[in-house]
Amino acid sequence: RSTIRTLKADYLAGDDIEYDAATAAGYAIYHLPAYYAAIGYVLATLTERGLLPASLRVLDVGAGVGGPALGLHDFVFGETDDREPTAGLVDYHAVEPSAAADVLDRVLGETSRNFRSTIHRSTIEAFEYDAGDTDDPFDLLIFGNVCNELDDPVAVVEDSLSHLADDGTILLLEPADRNTAIELREIERAIAGGDTDATVYAPTLRLWDGAEPDDRGWSFDVRPEIAVPA
């Protein structure tokens, strides 16, 4: 509990966090269930719109202890004890430089044989996209709760676009707090409004070509407590 409390306090204060073994364990206990659930909602949206193929290649940037990975696995293969499904194939690549990769390695060891996973113990800035067995593009690029950890998230996301399939999806997911929400909107607008073919289709679909919102992307402010009448 002490580790988790310190972790949350440092995060909310904007302080640097050392991702050692203790922090990784804290993340697994505290954050994994929430990240597992969050990815499921997004994958459901992609499926409803026909944007999630049965067989897909995935890059999970800042994969952490495996919340998004497990959510993706169970969404594709189901939450059953059957670990030999006959349909679907996921070529999953995780980029994780911290001690969380050790936890992730154990988590991925319990997945289906058709969930073929590779852990790249590297920062995304140093990651070599074409160093693997194939240089096929990715169908899904996941930036789950990691953009706020990057020195230049816009440059990183822009670089990843060249490794995305023409009909692929980049998923940017951040915690619902003020700083990360505002930064996420800034990244989104820099990418979609730049010299790329990237478009935004969820959760705020762009309806008019060349037009984009200019608000800060945060609508919740803390106000003084309401005085309850006697």
Question: Positions of the model-derived regions?
Answer:
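N-terminal auxiliary segments of SAM/dcSAM-dependent transferases
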Residues: 1-14
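A short SAM/SAH-binding and catalytic strip from SAM-dependent methyltransferases
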Residues: 138-153
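A short glycine-rich, Lys/Arg-flanked "PGG" loop and its adjoining helix->strand segment in the class I
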Residues: 154-167
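Conserved SAM-binding loop of SAM-dependent methyltransferases across substrates and taxa
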Residues: 65-86
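Conserved beta-strand signature within the Rossmann-like core of class I S-adenosyl-L-methionine
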Residues: 167-174
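Substrate-binding/catalytic lobe of Class I Rossmann-like enzymes that use SAM or dcSAM, i.e.
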Residues: 176, 183-230
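Class I SAM-dependent methyltransferase Rossmann-like catalytic core
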Residues: 17-49
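Conserved class I S-adenosyl-L-methionine
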Residues: 54-64
